[in-house]
A protein has these predicted regions:
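A short, Trp-centered hydrophobic/proline-enriched beta-strand micro-motif
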Residues: 181-189
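Extended, charge-enriched "interface" segments that sit outside catalytic cores
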Residues: 2-92, 99, 104
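A structural signal for short hydrophobic beta-strand segments in well-ordered beta-sheet cores
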Residues: 203-206
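Internal helix-loop-helix
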Residues: 111-182, 225-231
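A short core secondary-structure module
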Residues: 213, 217-264
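Conserved small/polar residues in nucleotide/adenosyl-binding loops
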Residues: 270-275
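N-terminal cofactor/phosphate-binding cores enriched in small/glycine residues
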Residues: 75-89, 105-121, 131, 236
Length: 275
């Protein structure tokens, strides 16, 4: 006997999201609204987002893009040096036993410029392409998952990538060079009562009376690299704006120095070298 099923209508991604929003409560609508406003506009949908919506579209990832010979050589040369360093210095079983990445390993990665892989060359970084960055993180992950997460979180959701995309020239000149000399960054979004839902976060940033700085108040958790970072990205609510006659929540990203008065790391979670 042949089993049959009735497929759901093949809604587009935006139509499906709007349909979900129309049936949700106020909090759900706010969360979806914030997510949609932050969504990047691409010529084609991403494979991952389509898969999430139940649409398998392999043509979005095949054939895989090829590197130019020049870019591939840059990656090959770096990976050769990196592989030698990892083989000689990184012991994932030691990371498992001690629950920390040895300082000597971190110092060695700093010398290799591993914390400035995508930082533009004009600011002291290596200026690698996204493809070479992906290749490098893949190599590190094959040795130790925790070390790969350290490097990836630092550069993708930590300060370097948001700074590269949205930072002012003054900010770039101030912060980018630090990542070539050992600064480690982290990302703080998740909160105890609301998880990773930015629409419901309670952390607030209020402009000081003299208008020179913001004052942040709140609690964050699950901040990858948070216990060893000296600079982090903190997501916080700022004063709402009136848009088309309606008040809209505002969420801003702040670059925060960890030695700022009032910042406290309460607890560090253990990790393993395996992903």
């Amino acid at each position: 006997m042949t089993n049959t099923r009735q497929d759901k209508p093949d809604l587009g991604q935006e139509e499906a999201i709007l349909a979900q929003a129309s049936t949700g409560n106020k909090e759900t609508k706010e969360a979806l609204e914030i997510a949609e406003e932050a969504r990047e506009k691409y010529t084609l949908p991403s494979f991952g987002s389509e898969l999430f919506m139940g649409n398998f579209k392999p043509d979005l990832i095949f054939p895989y893009p090829e590197q130019s010979p020049e870019d591939k050589k840059i990656g090959d040369d770096y990976i050769r040096s990196l592989t030698h360093f990892l083989t000689e210095n990184l012991d994932p079983e030691e990371v498992d036993r001690t629950r920390e990445i040895p300082k000597a390993v971190i110092d060695g990665l700093v010398k290799l410029g591993a914390f400035a892989l995508k930082v533009p060359k004009e600011y002291g970084g290596l200026g690698f392409s996204q493809t070479n960055y992906n290749r490098i993180i893949q190599v590190v992950a094959s040795y130790c998952g925790s070390t790969a997460v350290l490097l990836s979180a630092h550069q993708s959701i930590g300060v370097p990538q948001p700074l590269k995309m949205f930072g002012t020239e003054e900010q770039k000149k101030k912060f980018f060079p630090r990542f070539r000399t050992g600064s480690i960054s982290a990302f703080a979004l998740t909160e105890p009562d609301v998880g990773s839902d930015p629409a419901q976060m309670s952390t607030e940033a209020k402009l000081s009376e003299d208008g020179t700085h913001y004052i942040l108040n709140g609690t964050k958790l699950w901040c990858t690299n948070g216990t060893i970072a000296d600079i982090i990205i903190v997501m916080a609510k700022t004063a709402p704006k009136i848009v088309k006659g309606r008040e809209k929540k505002q969420i801003s990203a702040f670059i925060l120095e960890m030695n700022t008065p009032g910042v406290e790391v309460v607890r560090s979670e253990e990790h393993t070298s395996e992903l």
